[in-house]
Amino acid sequence: MGAAESLIETFRARSDAADRTNEIDPDNYRDMQRIGITAAFVPKELGGFGLQSIHDWTLTIATLARGDGSAAIAISMHLSATRGLAALYHRSEPGSAPHTRAKQVLEAVARREMLICSTTTERGTDNLHPLTEATACEEGWRLNGTKNFVTMSPLATHVATNVRMRNEEGDYIANVLMPMDTEGVVQLGDWDALGMRASGSQSVQFDNCLIPQDALRTIGPWGGWSIPVLVNRTLANVPLVGAFLGIAETAMALAVEGRKRLRIRLRGRVWPMPSL
């Protein structure tokens, strides 16, 4: 939280221009990498802060949002992905394939080499029924579909997302982490909203993307809840409340300060403004 506190004024100074141009500000993310926020969940032995507290995660996002709500929401998506990888690292047998993959990614995050955007949202369906699908092929899997609200995607090096995967046993929800420069990944540049304009929450299309055989990790049945899906959804959404809190705190502070400077008088009295 101390690291986040140091960035409030810097973020605030940049936020107006980013909002007006509807562009994500790369300097904010370089700053968060530099002071270690992006590696908050990376275990200490791998070069990170070793964060485990969801309370501290939420307050960190609230603190960042006092400077720039877009940046706070965007980096929370990255932290959600790295939290999951840290959990996988801790619970996997050392030397096993999941442990090794998680370790490699977390070390790359600590070296400031990776920013991960995370998304599940698709038009016309819900999180339990992803329509983006991985189809088995000789080389591994072919991924096709479109995800919406892929926050921070203009700057991300990798994307983590849930997809539909079918095998001889049935249909599953599987998670995949893949480089954004994979052939067939298309950034649609369609983010133009009234709020969170600098979050880079565009849509991303996967057009016959080839991914390795071991890149998919099943996390539950397609169309049904499972513990991994429930945990991931809960822990991805709770810290976003922190962003809303930070935005509201700043709005309150600005309103109070503005009221102090305002002197609207009528017949010698201050005009009543109970809303402020």
Sequence positions of predicted segments:
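A general structural signal for short secondary-structure junctions and capping/turn motifs
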Residues: 107-109, 151, 167-168, 194-197
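Short loop segments at secondary-structure junctions
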Residues: 89-90, 137-138, 164-168, 180-183, ...
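A generic structural signal for well-ordered coil/turn residues at beta-strand boundaries
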Residues: 114, 128-130, 155-157, 172, ...
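Glycine-rich beta->alpha junctions and the first turn(s) of the following alpha-helix
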Residues: 193-276
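A generic structural signal for beta-strand entry/edge sites
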Residues: 138-142, 158, 201
